[in-house]
Amino acid sequence: MPESYAGKINRKLLKKQRIIAAAAGREPADLVLKNATFVNVFSNELSTMDIAVAEGLIVGMGSYQGRSEVDCTGKIVLPGFLDAHIHLESSLVSPTEFVKAVLPHGTTTVVTDPHEIANVMGTDGIEYMLQATEDLPVDVRFMLPSCVPATPLDESGAILDYRAIDSFYDHPRVQGLAEMMNFVGAINGD
């Protein structure tokens, strides 16, 4: 039986309460990186402290207790890199191989516009990319191709408009609409 709306709300509320309690130190975090040297990329400073994680989120830095603790004395911790605009399929490797190449260099999140694969395969290409990037150790987010083909002069294997991509908007890793490549059409009000 599917979970009720009230059940979903209650589950989300309990998760948020757990995050707040761990952040405030009222209950142990799920994981604490003890004595980690943190690189503050905004202030250009190094600080040694505990880093608390609850429900998959960093909830605090300071002095924390955790259900699981890892001694990070002498270890450096820094934020992962985010590539805000790529066309993953243009790398000419599978999503799994792409992740093997970028993760060791610190990229933990990418936002991809699957425009090229949509040009060839239409919505099947978008669906493939969503499935092929599921459960990878890099967070792969999507912006939906805004116009396939890119311009009326292009020939492609598919034609996508807002009706074709509408069903993807409910996917949790779809963030919005990608770049408008048909600038001539935009200028002319097409």
Where are the predicted features?
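Histidine-rich, glycine-flanked metal-binding segment
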Residues: A6-P79
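Short glycine-rich, polar/acidic loop-and-turn segments at beta strand-coil junctions
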Residues: T37, E55-L57, I86-L88, P114-E116, ...
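Short, glycine/acidic-enriched loop or turn micro-motifs at the edges of active sites
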Residues: S43, I86-L88, N182
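Hydrophobic alpha-helical segments
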Residues: T48, A54, H85, L92, ...
